[in-house]
Amino acid sequence: MRTMKLAPSVFGAGIGNLSKQLKILEENNVELLHVDVMDGHFVEKMAFGPDHIKMLKELTTIPLDVHLMIEKPERKLDTIIDAGADIITIHQESTTRLYSCIEKIKSHGVKAGVVLSPATNEDTLKYVLDKIDMILLMTINPGEAGPGFHEELLTKIKNVRELIGDRDIDLEVDGGIDNTNIAKCKEAGVNVFVSGGYVFKGDIAEKIKTLREALK
C-alpha cells in the first residue's frame, strides 16, 4: 500500500511567522513542504526562487517538493538544485527538453517529476514514465490560489494511476485540496496531497489532523 503524504504549500503560509509555522509542520510529521516557483511568464504571478529555497532548507528538515512554474526550466535547474530542492517537478508544457531536464535533475541525486495542467492530456506521460519519481496533477490552473477543486478531474487522476501501474511513482494533486475532497482524491489514486490555504488558515496542527483523519 502506498504511503499517504501531506505536502503543505508554503505559498499559503504567512511569511512573518514562517519559522513558527514550519516548526508546527515538523511537530505534526508532515512528509513534504511544497514550494511553488513562479517566474511571471509561464504564469502571471511571481513567487519564490533559489534564495527562498535555500532559506527554507536552513529553516526546516522537511524535504522540499519544488514545483517549477517557469518557462524553459532547463535554464534554472542548476540553481534550484544547488539551493537544496529534494524533488523538482516541471510542467510538460513549459519546455521542449522535458527528457533532458529529467535526466539532469536525477543525475544530481534529486527526484524528478512532471506536472500536468488541467487541460493537458495525460498521454504525454507515456514517454517518461520509466524516468520519473512523481507526477503532479493540477486541479486548478497554474498560478491560481484558493478554493476551486474541479471534481471532474477525478477521472483524469484515475487514468494517470492506471498509466503508472506498479511503477514506484508518487501521484500528487494540487489545487483546492481540503478535508471535503481529499478522500475522493485518495480513492482515485493520489498519495501525495498539496494543501495551502486550508492548512495555514486557522490552527495548523488541527488542520493537519483533520486531513489525516479524512484519509483513514
Q: Which role does the model predict for each range below?
A:
Residues 46-66, 104-113, 153-171, 211-216:
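Alpha-helix-loop-beta-strand connector modules within alpha/beta enzyme cores
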Residues 74-82, 120-131, 177-192:
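Catalytic cores of alpha/beta
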Residues 88-97, 136-146, 188-208:
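Glycine-rich phosphate-binding active-site loops on the catalytic face of alpha/beta enzymes
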Residues 18, 25, 36, 80, ...:
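Conserved, mostly hydrophobic/aromatic
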Residues 39-47, 51, 118, 126-158, ...:
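Glycine/Thr-rich beta-alpha phosphate-binding loop at enzyme active sites
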Residues 39-104:
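N-terminal active-site wall of soluble small-molecule enzyme domains
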Residues 9-14, 66-74, 94, 115-123, ...:
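Glycine-rich beta-to-alpha transition loops that act as phosphate-gripper elements at the mouths
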Residues 5-9, 33-35, 64-68, 88-90, ...:
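Hydrophobic faces of well-ordered beta-strands that scaffold small-molecule active sites
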